[in-house]
Amino acid sequence: MKQINIFDEAIEECCSNPITGFYRDGFCRTDELDRGLHVVCAKVTDEFLNFSKSRGNDLSTPRPEFNFPGLKEGDSWCLCAERWKEAYECGFAPKIYLNRTNKKALSVIDIDILKDFALDLI
């Protein structure tokens, strides 16, 4: 299945170090198996990581058993659309890359909100 970004173009790689995405292929790809809808490519901040941890999703602690180094400020990561939206509503949403964000994010988050947080709009 072809994956497209919010501009109806081929989705760009979000990050390969650390490797991200539901399928750990570097892209914010999704399908029916991805219940969390990991489609928003964000540049994480310490504030967001602390917020996510407070909500029960610790993304900063290394988990060697899953080959996960833990995220640090400045890393790019495919976030769950609902988690990003929750962070936005609470004032902790990180900036995002629209060319790397899956169009499926629009089923959860308004495009104008996403554009306000874009790092790659000219």
Question: What are the roles of these predicted feature ranges?
Answer:
Residues M1-E47, L119-D120:
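Extended boundary segments
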Residues H38, E73, P94:
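Residues that flank catalytic or metal-binding motifs in active/ligand-binding sites
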Residues W84-S107:
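Short, compositionally biased
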Residues N102-I122:
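Glycine- and charge-enriched low-complexity intrinsically disordered segments
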